[in-house]
Amino acid sequence: MAGLGFWGHPAGPLLLLLLLVLPPRALPEGPLVFVALVFRHGDRAPLASYPMDPHKEVASTLWPRGLGQLTTEGVRQQLELGRFLRSRYEAFLSPEYRREEVYIRSTDFDRTLESAQANLAGLFPEAAPGSPEARWRPIPVHTVPVAEDKLLRFPMRSCPRYHELLREATEAAEYQEALEGWTGFLSRLENFTGLSLVGEPLRRAWKVLDTLMCQQAHGLPLPAWASPDVLRTLAQISALDIGAHVGPPRAAEKAQLTGGILLNAILANFSRVQRLGLPLKMVMYSAHDSTLLALQGALGLYDGHTPPYAACLGFEFRKHLGNPAKDGGNVTVSLFYRNDSAHLPLPLSLPGCPAPCPLGRFYQLTAPARPPAHGVSCHGPYEAAIPPAPVVPLLAGAVAVLVALSLGLGLLAWRPGCLRALGGPV
């Protein structure tokens, strides 16, 4: 007797439903072809003090390099991260730094620029300071002024649309209910700190937590009122504030104005490397907890915790070993998150796509969080509409010349971003 077939089987409809609902199976991993890394700077001094801080009068002694500056511990953390990256990519990267293989960009802050340099000293020890003079060589770290940085420092403070979205989140019933429950706590904290906290942006409370945590990490005694319960409550308040910035409502639109910009740049850089056959293997971004939080929000991976110092989120692009036509392309994307040097990095999966995720599926799932082709508000007239810059300056320059010959120099003059593209990856 002939078989019932899929549709004739009593369980057929249920099996079809499971096939539609369950995420696709994971694909086998293949050889590595490109890596993008986004990491937070290392340990730093507090960003600020507060009026009743018992250590305020000796701050210049405690933090001789100044508030917000990288500490010796921060340098050590970044050296360790660089050594971890060297061990992870030993067979992928050349043993010595090659400008055509690795590109590094940082925000224009001392702590992130120094963190990038310390990281590179661990990643390329042959070129690190302290090596024999004949072998030591500095490695360039690229940056742009803070006011012009829309890739790693997002225009949240100056973006009216983002403020509308944030106001919608902070006026939501759930947010207001949580805030009301902390009114008494914040009022008591005002008496201990000398700060106005009730009715003020929650970032003020976060700054108190940041100062206390920095002091505690460096062995300084905390005031009696700063109990573990107080620190825990401050962390919960901080998580509520972060959630309003990167989470629902309208999380995807927030991402288009923040972390989706960086996500788009990472994907665009890989696309150009593949399309033009460029030798670039790795792009590194030295930035802040806010950068990582926004990127986690764009990926749907924010877990309610602030990234620790030297936390690193990695994107690994691989040629996969399956059937490209069947599995949605010949490249996969895997994510990892290193947030604790004592443990192996955590493999992450994009919601809806187990790792390694086919690149086409990755593009599809992240599309709502990335800026649309026509651009978004709060960005310049050209930057949002022009594809991110080509990577590797010399080869990109050759491509730009060919474009100029075929399209005419007038087009490049009309689109100044194309000329800016000669500076390297975004």
From Swiss-Prot:
Q: What is this protein called?
A: Testicular acid phosphatase
Mutating A128P: what's the consequence?
In AI1J; uncertain significance
Q: One cellular component GO annotation, for this chain's record?
A: postsynaptic membrane
The record lists the catalysed reaction(s) as: a phosphate monoester + H2O = an alcohol + phosphate
> Biological process GO terms, please?
negative regulation of ERBB4 signaling pathway; negative regulation of neuron projection development; negative regulation of protein processing; odontogenesis; peptidyl-tyrosine dephosphorylation involved in inactivation of protein kinase activity; regulation of neuronal synaptic plasticity
Give the E.C. number(s).
3.1.3.2
Q: What induces it?
A: Up-regulated by mibolerone (a synthetic androgen) and dihydrotestosterone (DHT) and is down-regulated by estrogen and progestin.
